[in-house]
Amino acid sequence: MTQLEAARKGKITEEMAYVAEKEGVSPEFVREGVAAGRIVIPRNPNHKTLTDFKGIGEGLSVKVNANLGTSYDYVDVEEEVEKARVAIQYGADTVMDLSTGGDLKAIRKRILEVATVPLGTVPIYEAEFRAARRKNFFDMSADELFQVIEEHGKEGVDYITVHVGVTLKNLEVYRNSPRTTGIVSRGGGLMAAWMLHRGEENPLYARFDDLLDIARTYDMTLSLGDGLRPGSLADSTDRAQIAELLTIGELVERARRAGVQAMVEGPGHIPLNEVAANVQIQKKLTGHAPFYILGMLPVDTAAGFDHIAGAIGGALAGWWGADMLCYLTPAEHLGLPTPEHVKQGVIAFKIAAHAADVARGNKRALERNRRMSEARYRLDWEGQFALALFPEEARRLKEERGSKTKACSMCGPFCPMNLVEAVLKGKGRMELPVA
């Protein structure tokens, strides 16, 4: 029985109760959200190391995903395992293995071993990889793709990205809508190239019921990928993007009827003035399915610092209702990220998600910020470290340049909170040291 099927029968599962406790909401709130398809809990029972269940969706905190995985040029399995550990250490709520080089099955197995949070994959990468190794990737058969999906389910993958909206009809819309950067989704591009070369429909769309059968068997959440997402501001919110979203909205309903959890992936390169519209359109067209976005990236020119630019767009999108942010790293658009890049990406996007939680009125986020302000006013450093999103970094910076006073070394004896409080408490004129 899937989480969705259990919820519809009125059952509160172990995972629902856990999510409710973590989120500070009632188990019934979570159950109702899962039953309605507004919340998903990616949870494949075959993922034995998964202990930190996550709820993604409306009424819950904004989540962050961290992508990792090998590439054609760089294959270092232990580095990818280290990336997974680093991502989880700094607060990633889920991780995705996007490996395209090396022994993909062995890499996935190693990452599953250390992933205490849900793990996602993009099965078409492996299906195309096998076909390319045999002859060329156009040689991939539909059966081969579904075989890979089944294998991922058996191994314990919790959610899979499937580019079901890249259909022949939507590719016609794309071809008649000139773009600056074309198709930038790797999985979507692979599927589109396969379809155009062979003149065949997307098997994930044509055989969607087969996909649902596999997903239901392993309770794999479907992350309906946006293969036609914009890859530049010039292409944002265009006809191809919206045409694909309309198709995805229809498939969300079919997944729900089949008892399969589904969330929807979104852009991408979107200017700030279009962020709200993109979130609202997605929610409207998909029956408020959880929205999992890449960024959003509000500028195309932040190469080397896309994690900062993406966090800006992600915070705004989260405020408007996006439910999970896929992080960007400093290496985005430039190369395969290192563990340090992963760390910086997770940090930036956890801050963005927290900012969105505050704006959405999340009670725990608001309370944490209130307590931090009180500790800061008291110059209670241990209290501040405990409440900081990243305590170790806060402590390191405080101790790196300490002060002779109780305050920090920026203001020292001139700390305004200290000075004014002293006067208000009747301590009178304070003697300040002369530098």
Curated annotation (Swiss-Prot):
Cofactor: [4Fe-4S] cluster
Cited InterPro entries: ThiC (IPR037509), ThiC/Bza_core_dom (IPR038521), ThiC/BzaA/B (IPR002817)
Positions bound to substrate: 67, 96, 125, 163, 185-187, 226-229, 265, 292
EC number: 4.1.99.17
Chain sites annotated for binding Zn(2+): 269, 333
Gene Ontology MF terms in the entry: 4 iron, 4 sulfur cluster binding; carbon-carbon lyase activity; zinc ion binding
Record's catalysed reaction(s): 5-amino-1-(5-phospho-beta-D-ribosyl)imidazole + S-adenosyl-L-methionine = 4-amino-2-methyl-5-(phosphooxymethyl)pyrimidine + CO + 5'-deoxyadenosine + formate + L-methionine + 3 H(+)
Comment on bound cofactor: Binds 1 [4Fe-4S] cluster per subunit. The cluster is coordinated with 3 cysteines and an exchangeable S-adenosyl-L-methionine.
One Gene Ontology term from the biological process aspect of the record: thiamine biosynthetic process
Keywords on record: 4Fe-4S, Iron, Iron-sulfur, Lyase, Metal-binding, S-adenosyl-L-methionine, Thiamine biosynthesis, Zinc
Database matches in Gene3D superfamilies: 6.10.250.620, Radical SAM ThiC family, central domain
Binding site for [4Fe-4S] cluster: 408, 411, 415
Taxonomy, superkingdom: Bacteria
Top-level EC class as recorded in UniProt: lyase
Pathway of action: Cofactor biosynthesis; thiamine diphosphate biosynthesis
Family per record: Belongs to the ThiC family.
Function: Catalyzes the synthesis of the hydroxymethylpyrimidine phosphate (HMP-P) moiety of thiamine from aminoimidazole ribotide (AIR) in a radical S-adenosyl-L-methionine (SAM)-dependent reaction.
The protein's name: Phosphomethylpyrimidine synthase
